[in-house]
A protein has these predicted regions:
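NAD(P)H-binding glycine-rich loop region in Rossmannoid oxidoreductase-like domains
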Residues: 1-25
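Active-site phosphate-binding strand-loop segment of PLP-dependent enzymes
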Residues: 17, 40-43
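Catalytic helix-loop patch of NAD(P)-dependent Rossmann-fold dehydrogenases
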Residues: 21-33, 43-46, 55-108
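Residue(s) in the substrate-gating loop at a strand-loop-helix junction
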Residues: 52
């Protein structure tokens, strides 16, 4: 006897909160996975992490944002981008900010 197989095993979620939560998990978890992987690289490597101006506090600037501007997070997407910036900076300071490190990371 064949069992009817559910082709869509995941419950469909159409609310915006679920979508934002999924995007945020992907952004943050991918950043953590990349940074953790870099800790095990044994050759000279340069990494440029490109984020978005959405990570900064929105103050309706007419000029472009600078990396010294205040991080934001007033909506879920902005919060996840700001979280990624914080993660990258903490990994740089904790693991890659010494003369012996073969890994060089910058954000733009």
């Amino acid at each position: 006897m064949l069992m009817k197989r559910n082709l869509y095993p995941y419950k469909k979620q159409h609310n915006i909160t679920h979508i934002y939560t999924t995007i945020n998990k992907i952004l943050v978890n991918t950043t953590i996975n990349l940074l953790e992987s870099l800790r095990h690289v044994k050759k000279k490597t340069t990494v440029i992490i490109v984020t978005s101006d959405k990570c900064y506090l929105n103050i309706e600037k007419k000029s472009s944002y600078k990396e010294t501007d205040t991080l934001g997070g007033e909506d879920p997407y902005s919060a996840s981008k700001a979280s990624c910036e914080i993660l990258v900076n903490s990994y740089i300071k904790s693991f890659f900010n010494n003369k012996k490190s073969l890994i060089k990371i910058c954000t733009v």
